[in-house]
């Protein structure tokens, strides 16, 4: 029995949809889908209807793309209302979400809890010399503007940063309530640490990539593995003896060079895993 993970499926691309349909079944295994499935409820439902039939259990966390409110999609759900609609859709297929009790890993090895999280970002992944109120201006200097600024609405929160603060506070309370000594697999769409945002071509895009409030969560909450996506740069990194897995598939041009069975090779094995 294995725990796999993948993220950034971006199913609005036809090649990605075809690859999804070609993915072999893993009837004994679990799968983490770490956000950015697509932009529409139909794309989300395509993922759920496909992967819940091929894996014993699917665990989903939202990326930014799922939370977009597109002018063409009805109903026009925004912010928390859209997120809750996605949660309801997952539950209708038996997939777990950040709003459900954290599942215990039933596979071999010591006791572990899988922690799907929805945290968002608060523009703090930036150099210390950049003031908070200048973060967007700092990105604009490099001609960068994330589509979230137009399509990702924070209602009923005052801002995306305020929504992030509320999610961090609520998630921290749940993590603090875990049994002492219980190991975790932490799952979030965004990296938990600023140092892991490796974007050499667009370094100032980092402000839309997480929050510094989670910098020590891998040790504070006894993580064996931290799973994230968003960067479209698959990698295995180590920090403080903890394995960090960036599990993005990405856009067709980013994964096609991996060959015909790209999706199969992009499924990252989370458990059991290597040692440092």
Which role fits each region the language model picked out?
Residues 1-60, 66-72, 157, 275-276:
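N-terminal active-site segment of His-dependent metallophosphoesterases
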Residues 1-4, 102-116, 238-243:
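Beta-strand-turn-beta hairpins that frame and shape the catalytic cleft
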Residues 5-7, 31-36, 59-64, 96-101, ...:
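Active-site neighborhood of phospho(di)ester-bond hydrolases with catalytic His/Asp-centered motifs
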Residues 10-11, 38, 65-67, 104, ...:
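Short, solvent-exposed loop/turn segments at secondary-structure junctions
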Residues 15-19, 39-53, 65-93, 106-109, ...:
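Metal-dependent catalytic neighborhoods of phosphoester/phosphodiester hydrolases
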Residues 46-52, 97-98, 103-109, 132-133, ...:
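Short amphipathic alpha-helices and their capping/turn segments at secondary-structure boundaries
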Residues 93, 198-199, 204-207, 211-224, ...:
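Binuclear metal-dependent phosphoesterase catalytic core
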Residues 113-185, 190-201:
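Active-site-proximal loop/helix segment associated with metal-binding centers of metalloenzymes
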